[in-house]
Swiss-Prot record:
Keywords: Early protein. Induction: Expressed in the early phase of the viral replicative cycle. This is Protein OPG181. It holds the Pfam family Pox_A51. Belongs to the orthopoxvirus OPG181 family. InterPro entries: Poxvirus_A51. The gene is OPG181. The lineage of its organism: Viruses, Varidnaviria, Bamfordvirae, Nucleocytoviricota, Pokkesviricetes.
Length: 334
């Protein structure tokens, strides 16, 4: 069968944090319900265990788009930010389950094998005109042709992503004012900076054994650790994704950006630099001590810090999810 391509995960995705997320975090994710019907209609047969999970993988998405562009001379994008997670236990190597796609036109399935290093499965891929057998080792990615179904043999945990052909993504911004702070999980927001009077920032909040706030503000990098009380507040329900709707544009039409008030963000937090670190304070959340590499710009830092506080208080669909962390890209006027 033409068009079946297998990559090593590390060779396809050039982003260490996302690779670690794929390898380590998917088995802990809770099931999600507010999902595109095209994802729900992936039929999973046999005795396999399955789940529908959030899968924000921007670097994987870009890599798949590059591969498909070279094959089809067209761009592709994810149908849904969610994915099907399947766990197959089949020690006697007999075929188990059939994964029969709902088959909307021009859908490209991408299958990621995760789990134990020794796990190996075979994909028995079939279409209306041909069939093929592909071995998929752990931490490998198979990009399949359009309009196919597949059986499996062996042991594996599989993530199934659905892509389709797309035109260029619509701009995120329509009209802005200098009193806007705009955030999104989409990195392309940074490409729509209105002018040089605006700055970019990136925020990641991770809460596992401790809570870490990582910020890049106008090129300056901060790595902040929460005190114990603050960690307790941040870590509560960190994996709760039940309120997240899809943004597939066929079933759900959630906005892809959020506009916040710059004055509120500027006055919503405080920071103070001493000889050792930057002390950061978020009312109703807590305190952080941060290292810093770069120029100290207190107003910009306070805006980004207040955005972090907004994310902690409002865990909805706007930020991207990555295991025990969530992240957002932002822009604001200087």
């Amino acid at each position: 069968m033409d068009g079946v391509i297998v990559y090593c995960l590390n060779a396809l995705v050039k982003h260490g944090e996302e690779i670690n997320h794929i390898k380590n975090d998917f088995m802990i994710k809770p099931c999600c319900e507010r999902v595109c019907e095209k994802v729900k209609n992936v039929h999973i047969g046999g005795q396999s265990k399955n789940n529908t999970v959030i899968a924000d993988l921007p670097y994987m998405d870009n890599a798949v788009s590059d591969v498909c562009n070279s094959l089809y001379k067209k761009n592709v994008s994810r149908i849904s930010r969610f994915a099907n997670l399947i766990k197959i236990d089949d020690d006697d190597k007999t075929p188990t389950g059939v994964y029969n796609y709902f088959k909307p036109k021009d859908v490209i399935p991408v299958i990621i094998s995760i789990g134990k290093d020794k796990d190996v499965c075979e994909l028995l891929i079939s279409s209306d005109i041909s069939c093929a057998c592909v071995e998929l080792n752990s931490y490998h990615v198979a990009i399949l042709p359009m309009d196919v179904s597949f059986f499996t043999k062996g042991n594996a945990s599989l993530i199934i992503l659905l892509f389709d052909f797309s035109i260029d993504a619509a701009p995120l911004l329509r009209s802005v004012t200098d009193n806007n702070v705009i955030i999104s999980r989409h990195q392309r927001l940074h490409d729509e900076l209105p002018s040089s009077n605006w700055f970019k920032f990136y925020i990641s909040i991770k809460s596992d054994y401790c809570s870490i706030l990582y910020m890049v503000v106008d090129g300056s990098v901060m790595h902040a650790i929460a005190d114990n009380r603050t960690h307790a507040i941040i870590s509560k329900n960190i994996l709760d994704n039940t309120t997240i709707n899809d943004e597939c544009r066929c079933c759900y039409f959630e906005p892809q950006i959020r506009i916040l008030d710059r004055d509120e963000m500027l006055n919503g937090s405080s920071c103070d630099m001493n000889r050792h670190c930057i002390m950061m304070n978020l009312p109703d959340v807590g305190k952080f001590g941060s290292s810093m590499l770069g120029k100290y710009e207190p107003d910009m830092i306070k805006i980004a810090l207040s955005v972090a506080g907004n994310l902690i208080r409002n865990r909805d669909y706007i930020p991207g999810r990555r295991g025990y962390s969530y992240y957002v890209y932002g822009i604001a006027s200087r």
